[in-house]
Amino acid sequence: MSAVRRLVDDLPVLDGIEAEHRDRAIAWLNSTADIFRRAKPATPDPHLVTYVVVVDPATGDVLLADHRLSGLWLPAGGHVDPGEHPTTSAARELGEELGPPAASLVGDGPRFLTWTPTRGPDSHVDVSLWYVAAADRSRPLEWDRREFHAVRWWSRTALLDRATEGFEPHLSRFLAKLDGST
């Protein structure tokens, strides 16, 4: 867990919302070692998740997936397995959901953190560490049809115009942070 705490501590924050989410995450990490999901859908609550936002470096376009369970357009990602390092989880989820070698992680750690109540009857809190991966949008993907209805490349303009209802609620803030760091 100390590796997770270091990742959270070292993450620069974008705004007051991310600062609040980081403070909650630190308090949570200080209060328990039980941070990995052990049973579906929500044990323990909260639990650790990774997102991987895939970006085409040539165009800046972002790949999102129409997630079957959440009903939202989301980045690739998923739950961190017990004892797994979040960066290892991000790389694993990327391969499982988009097919190897769909994309490669950029940098050596997460870029963003969110504390988000999920939607639906089994609502719980996902503490999400957001990573970035690079991919060429012209290359075909072998995405997981069991998990997603579809995958789609979105231009930044289209996302900023639409990234509210039907999308991961913090996506536009993540993109603002990413744009500020590049």
Which stretches of residues belong to each language-model region?
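Acidic, metal-coordinating catalytic segment for phosphate/diphosphate chemistry
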Residues: 13-51
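Short, well-ordered beta-strand micro-motif
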Residues: 54, 132-134, 152
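Conserved Nudix-box catalytic region and its N-terminal flanking loop in Nudix hydrolases
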Residues: 58-96, 100
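Polybasic/polar functional segments that serve as interface/processing modules
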Residues: 77-78, 84, 111, 168-171
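Active-site segment of metal-dependent pyrophosphate-handling enzymes
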Residues: 99-139
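NUDIX/MutT-family hydrolases
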Residues: 130, 141-171
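Charged phosphate-binding loop/patch that engages nucleotide di/tri-phosphates or the phosphate backbone
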Residues: 169-182
